[in-house]
């Protein structure tokens, strides 16, 4: 399944620290050579300050149990730097702790003022706080890093050169500490900042591409994310354009999100348009599934693709949690489309198309009928499902049209009435002048 | 679609006015002309003398007018002259055996030269008064028309020794006069024996008056010879003098002696002039040329030490004559070549050589004074050669930098970093333009064109050299310009390697033209700061992609560049390129099975009915002076050379076929829909014109084939349809023009099958309750899943009221035909809906402006209308006016509505 694996591409757009979960996930999947993967992880880890993680990886690679001197030395160095940075920031943090309890915490401006007035706060302090946060992050201490970053965000003005970095750092740290709620907040803040800041076109595109990749992590883990991902990727032209030009592979996640979101069925049409447009740059079983089902009405193809989808999802870190939902919803989609087209279906064929056993399928359909989601009857003697839908009679059509007509006229009349009332008042007013 | 005619020649309007008027003048004069002819019937004795006298006097006035450049008067005198000549015509034919008298021809020749000179001199022409300009145009046309009758005489005159050569206007006037006089003298000697008796006979009658007048003029011959008109008078004098010599040479001995004296002086001047080797010179001239060869070394003093400053000084001296009216341009070129040889002989170094090369190039460009006309072939060859050798020199010597930014005084020829002023970029651009002009000049179907086209290689090579040079040392801007030149030679050429590479037949590392194009264009996208170069590069890039079937890349480029939005603001050449690009994109979409997109791309071009004009592949036949000659000239300059043309028949066929594939199923689906819109107007026109024919024969032309196919498709007969579209005739006419024609044909048949199936289902679904899918598949020779998919799509889109019955594999139709009453009711509802739509629209529209604060929206309900009328009385004057007016409108509106509704009810009743 390596040919549908997107980890390699996704990692290009993620922070070094964000890639570790992905890589670790892959280790458990046996798609790639375990040894090579671990070596790659080691190499990546070496670029950070996470000494313990490095050691752990070395152990897994069966390298010497002893810590090499070089590493020992580095560890000492790291600790020393950390100490130094902490010392620099300590007074200001103490002050913050004190102020936190007071009134001045409510508003960032008053807070800054209070800091400056009472504790001799300077810009250099902010600088060192930022450095410390960065250093902590690099050491893998995300929790503490967030608190410093939070401080920075409050104190910093949006014009500061580090402001964007702080935003990014905060988002990364929140993601890594699995704080999805705050991560979502930070995500929106970062997005607003990117949209409003004056980047050159190419920079903005780059920033958005990164944001898109990071946000996928958040969206699939936050309960509200499934609506938001559609909202952001599909209905914000700037982001849709970014996906189309820079990273069409994001279509996979967008498609998954649409499939598992039953309430947003109308997004499907737009999605399919985009998929068709980009079909030459990116295709994978998930987009192909939708294409088969809604463009070509090739149910056999859809069935096969659905089968492939399962393995793809199983091996994708981002969406692995949605596997069952996806399969269930995809089946429903196939069935719905089927029902719209057919008036009589044999259960055995249906079972075949849905990748189910006939008994299971019958049971499934019975459940659907029982839940009143389907107007149909089962002819068990012949093994058929007969749809109960009747086409619109001309009479009904007529009534429907007239219905809308009367609605519209009423609305119009209402408007007019309001206007005339207003006018009456006006004319009465004008009377007074005579 | 007047994409590029919109602002084509606004600036030319003034001159075009003048052109329009010209024919009227001609008509008038022609009328008078014939009138006079009738009068001439009476012949009187001694007419000849009278007539000739008349003629000479008019000629004299013309001369005087010319002298002060009084063009309107010249024009009227010229008209007098022609009239007088017509009068004299019978006499001439009788007395002179129909030979036109020389002085008359001479006058005509002079006049022509005079006009040409003024005409050429654009600067001067612009400064002329409006009246003068107008007359000049008229005069020029008249003279041109008139002298056609005398062409033979004129050419003989120009050849003959007493001529004042065509280049008269370029010559130093004094020497010119001398030459002419000399010529007439020499010519006299030669000719004397032949013509003597004849002239002798006629001379006495005429020479006396002419003599008197002319000798008066000739008194101040030497001092007053500044203007060339004067000098030509002198020539005339000598002609007369020759006649005098014939009769009484001894009497005029004094005159002759005078002549001889001057001759010595003139000889020197003459030698200089003779140097240019006229093609049409006779043997007598050649000896003079030889004389010049002897003189050549005169360029430098015999024992002068030839070094760089000297050569440069000479160069400056030669070039300073550039652009002057009487400079002999050919002489200049020759001199420059000579200078180059000299500098090469003396090893003066590469920089000097480059400089001279550069000057040769500009001299060659200068040779041709008319911008619209191409240069001569031999010059062209010379130019290419010089250009290439110069570029080679430049490339071989990296320490020379040549650019426009170097000021004259900072040029450096002696020590190492050399600086030369000049711009090879401009030169190569001009060279390229000249090449296009050359191509456009010759007939595209002749071998001439092919042989000319072979030079394309050389041009590309030259551009390549310049490009190399600028890649070494050139700022991004210049590189963009030269890249664009290369792109413009590249983009329309098909490279089969690209397709092979796509199929993996050649290794992926081979550099194809698409790769080259990519590289060049990307550089321009990144570096260019003038919008025009980028736009053109994008257009060419898309064109190239489309040509090689890179449909998606081409489409994305179009969409991302947002060209459609602002192409209307571009210059005509760019708009033409845009149209060409669109045409090609349409063809590409068609090849890539995107019929709808193909139609979209082509519809703008085809709907106007003049794709030929829009693609600049020929002018439409002119209707009633739609454009003036000036405008036509401009449009001609824009035309594409033939080898870059897009086949129009192919284009139209692709358009019509894609329109057919879209339109026919649509017609079938919406047969009874009141709101049906046509997709393609052009296609409808074709259909209608075929329906108008009382008898439709078997199709002959491409259009007839498509129409016949469309008719077959309407009854779902795919076989017939496919046969009409794909057959031997259509193959040779259209489809074989595609690179992979077989694939295209297969695709076409596939589409025809599918669309025919859809049409069939739309058209005949009401006669079936159910249709078996396998039998449909058999009928249309399509695989069952495909049929299934097509029908499913139709059901989902609610085009077909049916559903599938899986166990029996049939389509069950649900479409219950509405009863008559129901149908009418539906129609009625549709119309009422329209009414409500209109109401809403009116409401929305009025809401925005004046009526916002008033009670205005009462159109919906008649009751309010009445109320309002009552209120109306209470309102102030101005307001009341408004109100009443509005009420009237409203009432009118309501009346309309009522009428409409009544009508509708009536129609329903009738039905």
Swiss-Prot record, chain A:
> Matching Pfam families, A to Z?
eIF3_N, PCI
Its principal location? cytoplasm
Top-rank taxon of the source lineage equals Eukaryota
InterPro entries per record: eIF3e (IPR016650), eIF3e_N (IPR019010), PCI_dom (IPR000717), WH_DNA-bd_sf (IPR036390)
Say if the entry is tagged with keyword Metal-binding.
no
Localization recorded for this chain is: Cytoplasm
Gene Ontology terms: cellular component = eukaryotic 43S preinitiation complex; eukaryotic 48S preinitiation complex; eukaryotic translation initiation factor 3 complex, eIF3e; intracellular membrane-bounded organelle
| SUPFAM superfamilies xref list | Winged helix' DNA-binding domain (SSF46785)
Q: What GO terms in the biological process aspect are recorded for it?
A: formation of cytoplasmic translation initiation complex
Asked whether the UniProt record includes Hydrolase among its keywords, one would answer: no
CDD domains cross-referenced by the UniProt entry: eIF3E
Which GO molecular function entries does the Swiss-Prot or TrEMBL record give?
translation initiation factor activity
Cysteines paired by S-S bonds: none
Describe the location of the PCI domain by residue ranges.
219-392
Keywords from the UniProt entry: Cytoplasm, Initiation factor, Protein biosynthesis
Described by its record, this protein's role is as follows: Component of the eukaryotic translation initiation factor 3 (eIF-3) complex, which is involved in protein synthesis of a specialized repertoire of mRNAs and, together with other initiation factors, stimulates binding of mRNA and methionyl-tRNAi to the 40S ribosome. The eIF-3 complex specifically targets and initiates translation of a subset of mRNAs involved in cell proliferation.
Which family does the UniProt entry place this protein in?
A: Belongs to the eIF-3 subunit E family.
Q: How does it assemble?
A: Component of the eukaryotic translation initiation factor 3 (eIF-3) complex. The eIF-3 complex interacts with pix. Interacts with mxt.
HAMAP family tied to this protein: eIF3e
Q: What is this protein called?
A: Eukaryotic translation initiation factor 3 subunit E
Which organism was this protein described from?
Answer: Drosophila persimilis
Swiss-Prot record, chain B:
Name the domain of life.
Eukaryota
Q: Which UniProt keywords apply?
A: Cytoplasm, Initiation factor, Phosphoprotein, Protein biosynthesis
Where does the UniProt annotation locate this protein?
A: Cytoplasm
InterPro entries in UniProt:
EIF3C (IPR027516), EIF3C_N_dom (IPR008905), PCI_dom (IPR000717), WH_DNA-bd_sf (IPR036390)
Task: Identify residues that carry Phosphoserine.
Answer: 34, 165, 175, 184
The PCI domain covers which part of the protein?
642-818
Give the Polar residues compositional bias ranges: 23-32
Basic and acidic residues composition bias: which ranges? 241-271
Identify a single GO molecular function assigned to this protein. translation initiation factor activity
Q: Record's Gene Ontology CC terms?
A: eukaryotic 43S preinitiation complex; eukaryotic 48S preinitiation complex; eukaryotic translation initiation factor 3 complex
Q: Where is this region: Disordered?
A: 1-38, 155-181, 196-284, 851-911
Which residue ranges does UniProt annotate as crossing the membrane? none
Q: Which residues form the signal peptide?
A: none
Which GO BP terms, alphabetically?
formation of cytoplasmic translation initiation complex
Which residues lie in Basic residues bias regions? 885-896
Identify one Pfam family in the record.
PCI
**Comp. bias (Acidic residues):** 11-20, 162-171, 210-236
Gene3D superfamilies, alphabetized: 1.25.40.570
Family (UniProt) = Belongs to the eIF-3 subunit C family.
Subunit note? Component of the eukaryotic translation initiation factor 3 (eIF-3) complex. The eIF-3 complex interacts with pix.
What does the UniProt function comment say about this protein?
A: Component of the eukaryotic translation initiation factor 3 (eIF-3) complex, which is involved in protein synthesis of a specialized repertoire of mRNAs and, together with other initiation factors, stimulates binding of mRNA and methionyl-tRNAi to the 40S ribosome. The eIF-3 complex specifically targets and initiates translation of a subset of mRNAs involved in cell proliferation.
PANTHER family annotated for this entry?
EUKARYOTIC TRANSLATION INITATION FACTOR 3, SUBUNIT 8 EIF3S8 -RELATED, EUKARYOTIC TRANSLATION INITIATION FACTOR 3 SUBUNIT C-RELATED
Q: Which HAMAP family match?
A: eIF3c
* Protein name in UniProt: Eukaryotic translation initiation factor 3 subunit C
Q: Which organism is it from?
A: Drosophila persimilis (Fruit fly)
